C-alpha cells in the first residue's frame, strides 16, 4: 500500500504521540485488508520526513520528533515491511525555496542548471554528478540510520521533454541525441541509488515504480526500464503502475501486465503489479473505448489481482493509494468499499 505525503499530512501534528497514534491507525487498516508492505513517503519535495544531513524537514509535518523512526517502529510492530519512498528529482515549490536555506537546493536555485524551475516547482537535473551524488547520499543515510526494509522511487524522472531543462549540460556533453543523453543520466541516477542503498545496508532492497506504459517511460520519462530489469546493479524489483482497465484501448490490463511479466522474468526479478482504486466510479478519459469501464464494470481490482498472481514473475500487488481506499470521496465510497471487500476476499 502506498502512503503518500498527502495521506501523512492528514495526521500531521506537532505531537509525537498524536502522530504515532495516527500512523498506527493507518497501519491497522492496512493490516486488516491483508497488506504486508507499506511504501511511505520520506521525501516528496526535496525534503525529509526524518533527521537528514542533506534535506530540510518537511513542511507537511510539525514538531521536532523523528517521523521516520516512529513510522518504522509502528510498521514493524504490526509485522508490516516498511519501504522508504522518495521522489529523487522533484524539489520544493518555488514559493518554498527559503525553506532550503543552508542546503544544496537553496545554493543551486536560480542557476537553472542543477536545479531547474518547471512550472511552480523546482526539479533536480540528473545530468550533473553532484546532483546524483546528493540524491544517493540522501538514500544512503536512510538505510544506514533507520531499520527500513527497502527504498522505493516512483515515476518522477524527467519532468519535461523540452530542451531548455538541461540545455547547458547537453551542449557540454558532446552528444548528438538529447534522448540518449537523458537516458544515460537516468541510468546513472538509478544505479547510484542502488549502490547507495546497499552501502547503507546491504540487506535493504531497492525498487522502482515506473509508469505502466513502456513507451511513455522511454520517450517521456527517459527511463530505460528494460535495461534496469535485464542488467544487475539497478533494481531488486520492478513495480509498474498498471492503472489501466481491461478495456483500455491503448494498454489493456492483461496485455500490459504480461509484457511486464516477460521483462521481469527475463531479468530474474520480482514483478509487483501496481493497481489503483483511485479510478473507481470515474471516467478514464485516456482509455479510449474503455473510458467508462471503471463506472460500469464490477470487481476490476479483484480481477486484476487474480490475473496477476498467475504470472511467472509475480511478487505481489501494490495498491495506490491509502487515501483512495480508506478516505474515498463520498460520491464513490460505497463502490470503493464493495470493490475493496472483493479484493480482500480474493487475497485472503
Where in this protein do the model-derived segments appear?
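Acidic-and-aromatic substrate-binding clefts and catalytic sites of carbohydrate-active enzymes
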Residues: 9-21, 43-48, 61-62, 212-221, ...
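Short, acidic/polar
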Residues: 9-31, 131-142, 216-233, 253, ...
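Catalytic domains of carbohydrate-active enzymes, especially glycoside hydrolases
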Residues: 21-47, 145-150, 231-238, 308-317
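Hydrophobic faces of well-ordered beta-strands that scaffold small-molecule active sites
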Residues: 1-3, 38-40, 82-86, 151-153, ...
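Substrate-binding cleft of secreted/luminal carbohydrate-active enzymes
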Residues: 232-252, 259-348
Amino acid at each position: 500500500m502506498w502512503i503518500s505525503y498527502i495521506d501523512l499530512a492528514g495526521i500531521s501534528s506537532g505531537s509525537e504521540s498524536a502522530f504515532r497514534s495516527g500512523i498506527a491507525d493507518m497501519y491497522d487498516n492496512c493490516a486488516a485488508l491483508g497488506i504486508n508492505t507499506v511504501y511511505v513517503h520520506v521525501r516528496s519535495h526535496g525534503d525529509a520526513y526524518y533527521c537528514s544531513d542533506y534535506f530540510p524537514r518537511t513542511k507537511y509535518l510539525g514538531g521536532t520528533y523523528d517521523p521516520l523512526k516512529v513510522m518504522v517502529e509502528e510498521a514493524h510492530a504490526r509485522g508490516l515491511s516498511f519501504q522508504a519512498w522518495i521522489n529523487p528529482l522533484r524539489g520544493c515549490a518555488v514559493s518554498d525555496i527559503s525553506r532550503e536555506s543552508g542546503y544544496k537546493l537553496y545554493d543551486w536555485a536560480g542557476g537553472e542548471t542543477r536545479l531547474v524551475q518547471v512550472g511552480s516547482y523546482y526539479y533536480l537535473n540528473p545530468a550533473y554528478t553532484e546532483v546524483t551524488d546528493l540524491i544517493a547520499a540522501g538514500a544512503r543515510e536512510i538505510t544506514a540510520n533507520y531499520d527500513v526494509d527497502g527504498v522505493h522511487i516512483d515515476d518522477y524522472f524527467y519532468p519535461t521533454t523540452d530542451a531548455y531543462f538541461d540545455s547547458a549540460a547537453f551542449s557540454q556533453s558532446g552528444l548528438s541525441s538529447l534522448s540518449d543523453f537523458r537516458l544515460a543520466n537516468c541510468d546513472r541516477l538509478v544505479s547510484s541509488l542502488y549502490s547507495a542503498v546497499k552501502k547503507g545496508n546491504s540487506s535493504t532492497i531497492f525498487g522502482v515504480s515506473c509508469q505502466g506504459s513502456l513507451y511513455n517511460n522511454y520517450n517521456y520519462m527517459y527511463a530505460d526500464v528494460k535495461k534496469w530489469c535485464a542488467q544487475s546493479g539497478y533494481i531488486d524489483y520492478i513495480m509498474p503502475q498498471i492503472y489501466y482497465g481491461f478495456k483500455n484501448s491503448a494498454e489493456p490490463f492483461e496485455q500490459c501486465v504480461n509484457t511486464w511479466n516477460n521483462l521481469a522474468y527475463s531479468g530474474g526479478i520480482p514483478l509487483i503489479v501496481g493497481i489503483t482504486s483511485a479510478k473507481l466510479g470515474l471516467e478514464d478519459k485516456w482509455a479510449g473505448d474503455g473510458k467508462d469501464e471503471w463506472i460500469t464494470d464490477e470487481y476490476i481490482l479483484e480481477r486484476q489481482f487474480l490475473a496477476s498472481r498467475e504470472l511467472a514473475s509475480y511478487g505481489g500487488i501494490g495498491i495506490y493509494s491509502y487515501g483512495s481506499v480508506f478516505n474515498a470521496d463520498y460520491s464513490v465510497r460505497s463502490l470503493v468499499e464493495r470493490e475493496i471487500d472483493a479484493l480482500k476476499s480474493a487475497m485472503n
